[in-house]
């Protein structure tokens, strides 16, 4: 699907702006209705003056989205350009964020988590088949299509995605709690970084807190570099061995041994009937509330400081390390891996 930029003097001649939905680093998202129809879109409005020096980021996002058509991926429907703005008309999803929906449920089981992860795996497997690496998979980028109970899950936010022309990528980027060890070490990396992030997400979906978690950023990254995490009691006592085996294959430190999306889709926890059906909502929702509602999950991440501390720990030799330009957009901190939350 080729979407050419449509030039317009005034976007209000194309869409009626209904209300503000949110904002990003250099854009605002509004609910808009197409003139002459009842069709609604999420219109991403990007001032050109805010784009100076960042044009490649938006062009990359458009290039990636133009190639994608999948039922579990938020679609780019149109691109408009005015003298002052660039506008991306995105498919409107109305079901809310992943964690919010889990908290609102009447019950939640391991089978529900398996179904969610399977949908995301299918979408990411599709991206990988096109040579696209998302590079920023995290719960905030997983949205429900509708408010209904049977709604599908959607993958969003392709601002850091990359079309992998060769075998490997080199620029370090992503959100620290979800980045793979090879990315932190600034080794050449590929699609396996998305699988690692899905391992982190799967872990959280089953207990409500992350596998790598510390108040100290250097310790957090040291844990990731060592792939050091635990299935803590009592939080994991009622979770199946199949689920734990699945997560171990996704959080494999060696990207060559880590599952691909296709291998993950074939694992019995996804494709079979090994996921338990007992209600874990109480425990999971309590931990999500404690671990993800706090502002320290959103604070800015200082890549330069991280590199300095990690080198002191001897994890990355001098002269190597993550790119200080693209290292990350946000950080989280909290508990040590292997420790249950203490509040």
Swiss-Prot record:
Phosphorylated by CAMKK1. GO terms for biological process: signal transduction. Its main location: cytoplasm. This is Calcium/calmodulin-dependent protein kinase type 1B. The keyword Transmembrane does not apply. Belongs to the protein kinase superfamily. CAMK Ser/Thr protein kinase family. CaMK subfamily. It catalyses: L-seryl-[protein] + ATP = O-phospho-L-seryl-[protein] + ADP + H(+); L-threonyl-[protein] + ATP = O-phospho-L-threonyl-[protein] + ADP + H(+). GO terms for cellular component: cytoplasm; nucleus. InterPro entries: CaMKI_beta_STKc (IPR042696), Kinase-like_dom_sf (IPR011009), Prot_kinase_dom (IPR000719), Protein_kinase_ATP_BS (IPR017441), Ser/Thr_kinase_AS (IPR008271). Residues 15-270 form the Protein kinase domain. One of its GO terms (molecular function) is ATP binding. Residues 290-311 are annotated as: Calmodulin-binding. Keywords: ATP-binding, Calcium, Calmodulin-binding, Cytoplasm, Kinase, Nucleotide-binding, Nucleus, Phosphoprotein, Serine/threonine-protein kinase, Transferase. Calcium/calmodulin-dependent protein kinase belonging to a proposed calcium-triggered signaling cascade. In vitro phosphorylates CREB1 and SYN1/synapsin I. Phosphorylates and activates CAMK1. ATP binds at residues 21-29, 44. The gene is PNCK. Its EC number is 2.7.11.17. Gene3D superfamilies: Phosphorylase Kinase, domain 1, Transferase(Phosphotransferase) domain 1. Activated by Ca(2+)/calmodulin.
């Amino acid at each position: 699907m080729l979407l050419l930029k449509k030039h317009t003097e005034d976007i209000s001649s194309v869409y009626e702006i209904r209300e503000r939905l949110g904002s990003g680093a250099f854009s605002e998202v509004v609910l808009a209705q197409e003139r002459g129809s009842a069709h609604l879109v999420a219109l991403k409005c990007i001032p050109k003056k805010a784009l100076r020096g960042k044009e490649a980021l938006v062009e990359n996002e458009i290039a990636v989205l133009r190639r994608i058509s999948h039922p579990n991926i938020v679609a780019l429907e149109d691109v408009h350009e005015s003298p002052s703005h660039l506008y991306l008309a995105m498919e409107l999803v109305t079901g809310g964020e992943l964690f919010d929906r889990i908290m609102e449920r009447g019950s939640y089981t391991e089978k529900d988590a398996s179904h969610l992860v399977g949908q995301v795996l299918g979408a990411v497997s599709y991206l990988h088949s096109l040579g696209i690496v998302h590079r920023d998979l995290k719960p905030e980028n997983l949205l429900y299509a509708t408010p209904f109970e049977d709604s599908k899950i959607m993958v969003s936010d392709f601002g850091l995605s990359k079309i992998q022309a060769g075998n490997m990528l080199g620029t370090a980027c992503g959100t620290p709690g979800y980045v793979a060890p090879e990315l932190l070490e600034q080794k050449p990396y590929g699609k396996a970084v998305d699988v690692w992030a899905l391992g982190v997400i799967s872990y959280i979906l089953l207990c409500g807190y992350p596998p790598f978690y510390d108040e100290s950023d250097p310790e957090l990254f040291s844990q990731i570099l060592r792939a050091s995490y635990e299935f803590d009691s009592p939080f994991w006592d009622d979770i199946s061995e199949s689920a734990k085996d699945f997560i171990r294959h996704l959080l494999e430190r060696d990207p060559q041994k880590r599952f691909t999306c296709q291998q993950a889709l074939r694992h019995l926890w996804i494709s079979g009937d090994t996921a338990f059906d007992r209600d874990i909502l109480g425990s999971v929702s309590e931990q999500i509330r404690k671990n993800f509602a706090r502002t320290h999950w959103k604070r800015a991440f200082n890549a330069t400081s991280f590199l300095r501390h990690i080198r002191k720990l001897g994890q990355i030799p001098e002269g190597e390390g993550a790119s200080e330009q693209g290292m990350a957009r946000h950080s989280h901190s909290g508990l040590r891996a292997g420790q249950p939350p203490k509040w």
